[in-house]
Amino acid sequence: MGLLDRLSILLGLKKKEVHVLCLGLDNSGKTTIINKLKPSNAQSQNILPTIGFSIEKFKSSSLSFTVFDMSGQGRYRNLWEHYYKEGQAIIFVIDSSDRLRMVVAKEELDTLLNHPDIKHRRIPILFFANKMDLRDAVTSVKVSQLLCLENIKDKPWHICASDAIKGEGLQEGVDWLQDQIQTVKT
């Protein structure tokens, strides 16, 4: 990054660009969350399951996010690790209404946290306990317990209850992530 780029970021003329990985099991709401974070005129009305991955962009008050929306289908999860080095933050989405798959989500999270490209970095992780509007949803506190998030000691993390369709809880999460990215060296 050149001197003019740094100066324009400091003056607020240009936003710092960050690469974020959006991970989680299939049907957890990753694509819907990313879609809802985009400006309303850029939002898609028809959300389809992600095949492989897609790249989406949105902006916050001080950052420009490039999000790698990774498919959560079992056959595509092995692709995740190819993007770990580039990621400056992680959004991990959990379907809080699907108790049966919470064990699989925990296994995938453990695999992620123990990967050499993630393990020794203080990369911030934002968890969305999504689908809180559904009858069978458990609280974000319960999701945190089921995933044993309290054991994550070497990375900043935060969990937000969310309803991606209504957009509830999303801004709180993005605000936290923005603060972490600006203060944490990964």
UniProtKB/Swiss-Prot annotation:
PROSITE patterns: ARF (PS51417). One of its GO terms (molecular function) is phospholipid binding. Keywords: Cell membrane, Cell projection, Cilium biogenesis/degradation, Cytoplasm, Cytoskeleton, GTP-binding, Lipoprotein, Magnesium, Membrane, Metal-binding, Myristate, Nucleotide-binding, Protein transport, Transport. InterPro entries: Arl6, P-loop_NTPase, Small_GTP-bd, Small_GTPase_ARF, Small_GTPase_ARF/SAR. It holds the Pfam family Arf. It is a peripheral membrane protein. Gene3D superfamilies: P-loop containing nucleotide triphosphate hydrolases (3.40.50.300). The keyword GTP-binding applies. A lipid is attached at G2 (N-myristoyl glycine). Disulfide bonds: none annotated. It is found in: Cell projection, Cilium membrane; Cytoplasm, Cytoskeleton, Cilium axoneme; Cytoplasm, Cytoskeleton, Cilium basal body. GTP binds at residues 24-31, 50, 69-73, 130-133, 164. GO terms for biological process: brain development; cilium assembly; fat cell differentiation; protein localization to non-motile cilium; protein polymerization; protein targeting to membrane; protein transport from ciliary membrane to plasma membrane; regulation of smoothened signaling pathway. GO terms for cellular component: axonemal microtubule; axoneme; ciliary membrane; cytosol; membrane coat; nucleoplasm. Mg(2+) binds at T50. Involved in membrane protein trafficking at the base of the ciliary organelle. Mediates recruitment onto plasma membrane of the BBSome complex which would constitute a coat complex required for sorting of specific membrane proteins to the primary cilia. Together with the BBSome complex and LTZL1, controls SMO ciliary trafficking and contributes to the sonic hedgehog (SHH) pathway regulation. May regulate cilia assembly and disassembly and subsequent ciliary signaling events such as the Wnt signaling cascade. Isoform 2 may be required for proper retinal function and organization. Belongs to the small GTPase superfamily. Arf family. Interacts with SEC61B, ARL6IP1, ARL6IP2, ARL6IP3, ARL6IP4 ARL6IP5 and ARL6IP6. Interacts (GTP-bound form) with the BBSome a complex that contains BBS1, BBS2, BBS4, BBS5, BBS7, BBS8/TTC8, BBS9 and BBIP10. Interacts (GTP-free form) with IFT27. This is ADP-ribosylation factor-like protein 6. It comes from Pongo abelii. The lineage of its organism: Eukaryota, Metazoa, Chordata, Craniata, Vertebrata. The gene is ARL6.
